[in-house]
Each structure stands twice: as C-alpha cells, then as structure tokens.
Amino acid sequence: MASKGILKNGGKPPTAPSSAAPTVVFGRRTDSGRFISYSRDDLDSEISSVDFQDYHVHIPMTPDNQPMDPAAGDEQQYVSSSLFTGGFNSVTRAHVMEKQASSARATVSACMVQGCGSKIMRNGRGADILPCECDFKICVDCFTDAVKGGGGVCPGCKEPYKHAEWEEVVSASNHDAINRALSLPHGHGHGPKMERRLSLVKQNGGAPGEFDHNRWLFETKGTYGYGNAIWPEDDGVAGHPKELMSKPWRPLTRKLRIQAAVISPYRLLVLIRLVALGLFLMWRIKHQNEDAIWLWGMSIVCELWFALSWVLDQLPKLCPINRATDLSVLKDKFETPTPSNPTGKSDLPGIDIFVSTADPEKEPVLVTANTILSILAADYPVDKLACYVSDDGGALLTFEAMAEAASFANLWVPFCRKHEIEPRNPDSYFNLKRDPFKNKVKGDFVKDRRRVKREYDEFKVRVNGLPDAIRRRSDAYHAREEIQAMNLQREKMKAGGDEQQLEPIKIPKATWMADGTHWPGTWLQASPEHARGDHAGIIQVMLKPPSPSPSSSGGDMEKRVDLSGVDTRLPMLVYVSREKRPGYDHNKKAGAMNALVRASAIMSNGPFILNLDCDHYVYNSKAFREGMCFMMDRGGDRLCYVQFPQRFEGIDPSDRYANHNTVFFDVNMRALDGLQGPVYVGTGCLFRRIALYGFDPPRSKDHTTPWSCCLPRRRRTRSQPQPQEEEEETMALRMDMDGAMNMASFPKKFGNSSFLIDSIPVAEFQGRPLADHPSVKNGRPPGALTIPRETLDASIVAEAISVVSCWYEEKTEWGTRVGWIYGSVTEDVVTGYRMHNRGWKSVYCVTHRDAFRGTAPINLTDRLHQVLRWATGSVEIFFSRNNALFASSKMKVLQRIAYLNVGIYPFTSVFLIVYCFLPALSLFSGQFIVQTLNVTFLTYLLIITITLCLLAMLEIKWSGIALEEWWRNEQFWLIGGTSAHLAAVLQGLLKVIAGIEISFTLTSKQLGDDVDDEFAELYAVKWTSLMIPPLTIIMINLVAIAVGFSRTIYSTIPQWSKLLGGVFFSFWVLAHLYPFAKGLMGRRGRTPTIVYVWSGLVAITISLLWIAIKPPSAQANSQLGGSFSFP
C-alpha cells in the first residue's frame, strides 16, 4: 500500500529492509495537475515490463490471499493480491501483497459420476470441459462409456449429448467464450473495452452501440419464453414450452388492503375529529377570557398550531396497506431450469452492499466485522453479491479487522450454509437465549458448532487485540527508524571529522503495517497527508469475485469441519477509503456513499445497491430476496428503492425512550406505502442504481397525480405542458422515444470516467424485470444474466481509485442531482425526496422475520443528541429548495404533505414549550385559559379526547403495535419536543441567518462501563444543556401545583374549577415527562450534583420572577393569615 507521502521521490518507501523498487503506475499527470488513469491498451503499449516490479506488503491470510492459486487467472490473481492507492497529488499505484506460504492446494475438479472421482476433462488451456449444458463434470473414461454404452445420454440431466465425439467436445469448449459472449447484446466498436461491456447506447453514427434485436433472436441458442419469433429446434425441446403452458403466471408480490371494518371507521373518526377541532377552535376564538386575555391569547395560538400539526400528520395515514412476497415464485422464475436457462443458473440481478463506518473508536470494528460476516453469508447467489466497506476515517485498525473477518468468513459462511443458521451474525447467533439445537437434524451439527464457536472466540481475541498490536508495532518500527537516523548522522560526522554533539532528530511517528511500511491512511498521531481530513485514496480487494460455478471442499482435517457438498465460495469484499485533502468539502456520509457508488459501478456494477450502517446486520438471510421480489415484479421498474423497517437489539424491556420507534416504522411508514412510498431512513434500503443516478422513471409521462387513494385518478395527457421548474429539477436523463439513452451530456453530470459512463446503460438493462408477461412494458429477456461477471484487472481498479479522489466531483452534478444529496445532516430524507419528486415510487417491505437489526442509544443524553441531529436536518430541509412546498407535480398531494410535515415538525417545539408552562401560569395567577369550565368547553374537550383515543386504538389494530409502545412514543414526543427540537430550531435559524455551520459527532456504540449489566448505559447520567428546558418545566409545574393548592385552601372563596383545570393540565405534562425524570435519577449515587443545583436554582428564579412581576396584594396577605411581605 502506498500514498503520496510514502512513494514520492521515485517511489521509494521509507523503510530500509531492502532496496525499494518502482511501483506499478497506472496514470499520468496532465498540465492542470490532475492524474488521468491509463487504459488497458495504454498499459500494454506505453509502460515497459521494467516498470512492473513488486512492492511487497504483508497482510493476514484471507480466502483470497492464497499463493499461486491455479484456479484464478493471472489478471484476477494480480488484482486480488494488490492494494491500490492514489489521489489528486499522487499517481495511481498498485502494490503487490506478499503471500504467506501455504500447503493448501486448489481443489481439482473431480468426476461427478458415482464411484469414479477421477480428474475431469480439460482443454489445452487448462479449462474444464463440460460436454453437456447442465455443467455435469465428467472424466474422459466416463464420457466414453456414456457415449458408447449409455446411448449418448448425459449421466446428470439424462439428456442426449449434442457432441458425441471427443474432437467435437474440445472444439465446442474452445468456442465456449464466443457462445457466452453472444448471450448478451454488445456495443460494436470502441475497442476491447466496449466489447467487454453491454451497451444500450445509440451513438450519432447509428450502427455503433445500437441494440441489435436480430442478434438476440437469431444468433443465440437460448430462448426467451413463449412468443419468440424463432423457437430453437436443437435444444432437446419440441413444441411449446410445457412448463410455461402448465404453470400460470404468478406475481412476486401481493398488496394486502387493510380490512374495511378497521379502515373505514378510522377515516370516519379522522373526519369527526377534524370537524370537532374546527368547531372547538371557533368557539375558543369567540369566547375570550377577559380576566386573563394574555393567557387566552397564548393558549389559542398554540392550539391553532397543534391543530395544523395534527392535520399534517394525520392526512398521510388515510391509506395504509400491507404487502407480502412469494419467494417460491422468485425461485421458479430466476433459478429453475427453463428453455431459456437450461442449466438453472441464477438469473437474478447483482446487488452491491455498502457498509459505512467513520471512527473505529465510536464504532467498534468487531461490530462492523460481524455485520460484514452476516452479509457474506446471506442467502443470495454468491456471484451476484459484492460488499464494499467505506472507511471514512482511513484507519489501519479497520483495514486489518476486515482482513481478519475475510479470513474467518472462510469457515463461518460454509457453516451457515450447511446448517441453515439464523441469524448469520456470529456474535448474535452464539448469544441466542433460545435452544441452538432446535430443528437441527444433521448429526455433525454439535461438533461443527463447537469448532466454529472456538474459532470465533479466537477471532474476537485477535480483533480486540489489534489496537495494541498496531500501537506496539508502530512504536517498535519508529524506534528502529530513529536509531537508523542517529547512526547515519554519526557516520556523516565521523566522515567529516566533526566531533560536535549530536542534534536531536525529529521523525514523525507513523503508523506501520505488518511488513514494515507506512500506512497510507490516517496515522495514530496525525501528520500532514496522514490525518482524518488529509490522506490518499485506498482500495483493497479483500475477497476476489467468486467463480461462476459452485465449488466445494471435502473434510478439512485441520479445522475438522466437513464441508462436503457445501458451496464454499465467498462474495467479493472490497475495502475503500476515499481520498481526503484540505480545501475539499468531504460532505460527510453522503460524500462517502457517492464515492462507493462510483467505485462499485466500475468494479461490479450491480444494478441494485443496499446500504447498511456498520451496526445493522442481516438478521434474515433471505432479506435480499424479499426486496428483489418487489424490484422484479410487474411494474417494479418504476420503484426507486425498497425500504426495510429498522429493528433494534439491546433496548431495555420498558423501552423508556421509545428507541424502537414502532409508531413511525409500523404506522407512518405503512401509511406512506399506500401513497407514493415510504421515506428513506438512512439504512436498510435497497436502491435501484439508475434512480440514484438521477434518471426519471420509465413511462414518466404517463404518471398520475391523485389527491388521495380514495379519489379517482386522472391520467395526464401528453398535450399538457410540463412546468419549467419541474424540467429543471428532474434532469433530462429520461429515455428517448426509441429506447436509447442520450449520453452526450453524461460527462458533465457524472464526470469524465468513461468506465463509469459505460456502466450506466448496463445497470439500467440488468435492473429490468423479466419480460414474462404482456403487462411488463420495460422488461429484459429471461436468461440474460446467467453469464458470469467480468474479471477484475488492474486498469479497472486503477479507474476506481480515480473516481474516489477528492477532485472528481468538481463541476459535476454529484450531490446536487446525482447520488446522495448534499447540504443536510439528514441526507437520507433529502435523497428519497428527490427521487419521489422525479416521479419514482418506493415500497415498504415488512418481512415475517426481521430483515435487519441494529443498535440504538439507550442513554438519555445520547438519545437526545440523536433526535437533535434528525430535527436539525428537518429544519435545514424546511429552509432549502427541498421544501415540499416547491415539489413538482409528479409528487402526490398526500405525499407532499408528508414531506412538508418532515420539515415543519421541529417548529412545534416552540408552541409546545409555551403550552407546557401554561398550567403553571394558570396556577400561579389563579386564572385559566377559559373564563369558566362550562358544559360546552367540557363537551368539546371530551369529544376531541375520545376521538384521539379511538384513533389510537384503530392504529394499534391495523399496525400491530402495542398500547405501551404508543404511549412511550407520546411521552418521548413531548420530551424531544421540549429539548432537542427547540435546540434544532435555534441551530437551524443560526445557519440560515448567520451562516454558522452545524457539526455533529457520531453516536457512540460502545458498551457501558459496567460490563456485567446489559443496560448499564441506561442508568448513566451525562449532563447536557438539552436537559434544561424539560427540567425547568418539571420544577415549575411542581411548584405551581403547591402554590395553587395553598391559595385555594386558604382562600375565602375557593375556585376549585380553575384549580382542577390547572392541576389536571400540570399532571398531563408531568406524566409525559416521567421517563425524563426517571432518567435523571439514574442509580443511587450516580446522579450528578449539577442536576440538583440546576433544579433548585431554576425553580427559585422562576418563582421570584413571577412574584416580582405580580406581587400578592395586601388583601391576599391578610387572607393567608400571615404578616410576612416581600421587600
């Protein structure tokens, strides 16, 4: 690994074990100072073989780090064993990793005929020869017996061989690559690079890059289902496809409407409460409290705002729905042998999974490693998965932890596949409280589990010991470097005859890797070019792309785990740390995600992207398939993303601070699913890549804009003009009338990477659903994705280095209209809003078994800071162009109201705090918000309260949440509204008015100090200024209740109605703030003294201030029977 600070001045590393050799260069400097990556042809022609020398780096053994793997090609082996670095100020370089010697040899394919086991047939290049399309492996002798004595029938699929002679089989094998190449459309021209990529681009010349449908129909030997122009006659299938004729077409998903007995009363109650609120507010405005007009005025303003807030929150809930998937149909369509896919290879599209981390101190690397292991073990075609780890901190600790995880995955992933383990996060699995042996029928499960558990414990010890190991290693190398420098200085002085005292030598304390070279990322002690905001870009392929065919190994005597018949392949795993330099805005998480989008487009180009936080792991191994059911179903090409609910572990049983947030995830999100789709919540979301690129959805001109799900829909006619602002907002990236993309403007939008631009039409085509039904208007032929992916070569990874550099996004539309959107701390909501604003739809996928699980802060202070960040992002959205008031006509009205509520809800805190002080002011003054508690007021109040309770009961009914969860949400709504939301409004206003930027720190995911208590963090009290407003409300209301009782008891004419009104109001406030007060109590002896000091000072100050403003009269003093008076 190398960076600018390591290999400048001729590419010599700063170590002295041996003479350094020049590294492999993949770019050149332009006149402007930028570095442009060489193409593959440039590498072959311009760089001599002398330049290709090795720079050795030692890394831990991984499944890919095996020496001289004969199964891998030279290019792929070179890429998987090299680490690439580069950036704005350094040439892109590849550095070959030093391999550790291993006695393990690659497994040689054996004949699959029972009782044989000989080596299978191979051609002159050493590639396997498979004479049948079913890929049944057979040796020469068995093949001869099958042809001569078996009637020419394959022993595997029982179908006749097409080639019965050995020469014909060899000839067919030599042309296998050509036949496979014809199974997908190609661009014609632009050299070898374009020949390797599927192109749907229509150039100005017409023929180059044009989609040749005739080539699909006449030059291929596959078939794409019933209805083709030509039905192949030589595939062993005669007549019509029996499977398609016997099996009716079935959808992959179903929409489950809420029962009319529940949803109809729900909508009726909403209408009743809306009318009651209107009548109540009109009555309140007409009947003023002349004795306390100021109290009446404050209350009526707050109530008007609360009514508006309730309407904005309630209207999008009118159309809730549920959805269900059918995984058996997905398997039948994409993984079952058909005439178009006779081998039954998976025809599912690829998925690129993004895992983001930034600080290994606050986000433990062991948590991230467990998340990676759960992804690698997911139940999805191995060759269709690619996992990218974004280390925005550039830490060596994260890099080495990922290498350890890749090594342990070689045992963990096959173990999960063999015994169908759930969940596939090893830490969660081994800590299950249920019986781990339930429903396990294989006799060797106990032995395998015991062995894997021992290996995992050793894995944890190694990962937990990495920080100390890196620190000790760095100290040792630094000491050696200082000694060498001092010796060199002495030699120079002796040679020159100078006997002066040695000068102190200052050498920057670097972070060293295991081979004795500098780490190109962030050092433990920051220095120029090696700090969090200043380091080179790094890409390391931890696990190379797997082979297209399943591979298995026999019993491993060393590990004593029998993996016979188990697919031992692992998905591709890539470590990425984007380049950071001073003077460039890194745009936090959104910038890191966009860097991964570009790098993954070049290296794997999965048409779908799943992003996960480092602490959210795959709890349901079939979750990827569940999401793919929606994307591949009829009409799925108009879906921009599939959002999964967030579920959390490690929450206290009472869920004191509403961390589960079930009201949002099970009520609001299900309701939005009935409109245009749920909002994007930052993790657990499966994206369509071209939607992130800023494309309009297919058939965007035929979109509808209903006012609600209950009213009839009106289709927009083509004669109606598009608004100008809508055209500017949605980017003119839509498909032309002939179905081809206009790519002339792509470099201005996506940058100057030709690799990236070439990958866009490929991702669009591969993301289409199957054209297996007449209603599928934008489908692809079945069997089009059964060919293996391209192998990685050095030029591809070098190009990936260039697109993660700090300068690449300059003068492009990344972050403004393409990818994750910049400008808000809640980039997730803004990104989802932009997609919906272009007319895309999204769906909410609630699986029977939770798809993903993560952690949430159970500490009060951490929870408040989390809510503060969310609310601040909402304020930023409200004051930006992403305000839903400026949404295009492609967004549905109720969806627009939902997004408008996202930006408005923090402002409710201003009115909420005022309203929480009103009962105290009533008790202090002896007045109430109304003149008298008459029957009309009480009737309105009763109707509003009863309808609210009934609506809550019906929401609980159709969403499936518990009553306690609903009440916890109500409590924390007031806690957050009187603390974090108010601070968010103030910070947002400061940013808009004064331009003061807002900075947030990551929420710590470390466990508490008390390791014996799972919920130790729950009781820890950490003081923050956010606690002052709710603490003040509690103390003032308690004092006001005491004052109100005293005044009423000693009054000659007690006004019990006003006292009861004020006391009831105060108890309502205090009941909502009870979890906050309980959190301040902590455990005995743990509550900070400052809490008591602030409580007393605030209560005394407010009381004295009130008395100074309105001192008691002499008559009141005489009634109280006391002669004491304030000065």
UniProtKB/Swiss-Prot annotation:
Pfam families: Cellulose_synt (PF03552), zf-RING_4 (PF14570). GO terms for molecular function: cellulose synthase (UDP-forming) activity. Specifically expressed in root hair cells. GO terms for biological process: cell wall organization; cellulose biosynthetic process; plant-type primary cell wall biogenesis. Keywords: Cell wall biogenesis/degradation, Glycosyltransferase, Golgi apparatus, Membrane, Transferase, Transmembrane, Transmembrane helix. It comes from the Eukaryota. GO terms for cellular component: Golgi membrane; plasma membrane. It is an enzyme of class 2 (transferase). It is found in: Golgi apparatus membrane. The keyword Transit peptide does not apply. The chain crosses the membrane at residues 262-282, 292-312, 910-930, 936-956, 982-1002, 1025-1045, 1059-1079, 1089-1109. Disruption phenotype: Plants develop short elongated root hair with kinks and swellings along their length. Residues 1-24 are annotated as: Disordered. Coiled coil: none annotated. Induction: Down-regulated by 1-N-naphthylphthalamic acid (NPA), an auxin efflux inhibitor. InterPro entries: Cellulose_synth (IPR005150), Nucleotide-diphossugar_trans (IPR029044), Znf_RING/FYVE/PHD (IPR013083). It is a multi-pass membrane protein. The keyword Cell cycle does not apply. Belongs to the glycosyltransferase 2 family. Plant cellulose synthase-like D subfamily. PANTHER family: X-BOX TRANSCRIPTION FACTOR-RELATED. This is Cellulose synthase-like protein D1. It comes from Oryza sativa subsp. japonica (Rice). The gene is CSLD1.
